[in-house]
UniProtKB/Swiss-Prot annotation:
GO terms for molecular function: double-stranded DNA binding; single-stranded RNA binding. It comes from Photorhabdus laumondii subsp. laumondii (strain DSM 15139 / CIP 105565 / TT01) (Photorhabdus luminescens subsp. laumondii). PANTHER family: NUCLEOID-ASSOCIATED PROTEIN YEJK, PTHR38772. Keywords: Cytoplasm. The keyword Cytoplasm applies. The keyword Cytoplasm applies. GO terms for cellular component: bacterial nucleoid; cytoplasm. This is Nucleoid-associated protein plu2870. The lineage of its organism: Bacteria, Pseudomonadati, Pseudomonadota, Gammaproteobacteria, Enterobacterales.
Length: 334
């Protein structure tokens, strides 16, 4: 992994009681050794694999202003991180889920892109066995379950300040509260919505198929091609690029897919992250509610599975063997 750490600082937030969240500030930057490199590689991997929300700084963002000064050399990275940690404490203390933790600020490069990552990491206790086969207690950072993390694409921010996607943050296990916390701390507003972009892509695909007057099988084959490209990008950790997608798809009429989507004003970005749950709709139908969960391949619709909109009735011809076995057992009273 070509990850190069430029500067990294650690501080700590300690919850003394329900009303007090203390801050402990480090007096020097963390030395970059193999342990630190391994930790950042793991944190980068975990962060990259999780679902993220996008944002951009508000004009009055204190963090953005402080970061600009730090980037210009008016303040060193340690001083920037110490002041930011104090602001972080003030914002986090407003929320009932505040538990403290290790605060990490890391400026690093990955694949020619410069990032600033900010995280609050929880610590966990575990046990290890030493050479004498005795048990020892160990304390470790719970990086795999990190959910209070934000990252600024410094390269994008400085070269394209009008961008709506240079700032990302995790949605977190406590949902909207974490989003609110990061918005307050960063003084940022919501930017590009990846799920909306993916939904727009699906609508554009359906409309393009309709313009090409494709039959049912042809439409599903086209959707499958779109899904294959998008899934490959997702697995590779790359974004969906409309131009590349268009080049991989057949053209109907005088316009290729990219030209069609631009003319119809779907407001699709040139590239955007793939959203797994949305893209799955290209090849599957799925839904749940009222104690019922249904999931089936789209190609079965109209062949083995039929829907009557007048009565809202779904008819399935041929059930899976394991389901059929359960139904037979229950019907016979076993």
């Amino acid at each position: 992994m070509s990850l190069q750490i430029d500067q990294i600082a650690l501080h700590q937030l300690i919850k003394r009681d329900e009303q007090t969240l203390d801050v402990v500030l480090r007096d020097s930057l963390l030395a970059t050794d193999q342990v630190v490199e391994d930790m950042m590689a793991e944190l980068h991997r975990v962060y990259s694999a999780k679902s993220k929300a996008y944002g951009l700084f508000n004009e009055e963002s204190e963090l953005a202003e402080a970061l600009r000064h730090q980037r210009k050399g008016d303040e060193d990275f340690l001083g920037f991180s110490r002041a930011a940690t104090a602001r972080l404490r003030d914002e986090l203390a407003k929320y009932p889920f505040a538990e403290g933790g290790t605060v990490l600020f890391c400026q690093y490069r990955y694949l020619a892109v410069e990032y600033l990552l900010i995280a609050v990491l929880n610590s966990c206790n575990s046990m290890s066995v030493n050479d004498n086969l005795d048990l020892n207690t160990t304390h470790y950072l719970d990086i795999p379950h990190a959910d209070i993390v934000a990252r600024i694409d410094l390269t994008e921010w400085e070269t394209n300040p009008e961008s709506s996607r240079y700032l990302t943050f995790l949605k977190g296990r406590v949902g909207r509260k974490v989003s609110d916390f990061f918005m307050d701390f960063l003084a940022a507003s919501e930017g590009m919505n990846a799920k909306v972009q993916n939904k727009g892509l699906l609508q554009a695909v359906d409309d393009y198929c309709e313009s090409g007057e494709l039959n049912k099988d042809e439409r599903q084959a086209y959707r499958q091609q779109v899904y294959n490209y998008c899934n490959e990008q997702l697995q590779a950790g790359e974004e969906i690029e409309i131009k590349a997608l268009s080049q991989a798809l057949p053209t109907f009429g005088e316009q290729n897919f990219q030209q069609f989507s631009q003319e119809q004003e779907y407001e699709l970005e040139e590239s955007f992250p793939a959203d797994r749950s949305t893209l799955r709709q290209l090849t599957k139908f799925a839904g749940s509610g009222g104690g019922l969960t249904i999931n089936f391949d789209a190609m079965l619709f109209g062949e083995r599975i039929f829907w009557d909109p007048a009565t809202d009735t779904l008819t399935i011809k041929g059930t899976p063997p394991n389901l059929r076995d359960q139904l037979q057992r229950r019907s016979s009273g076993h």
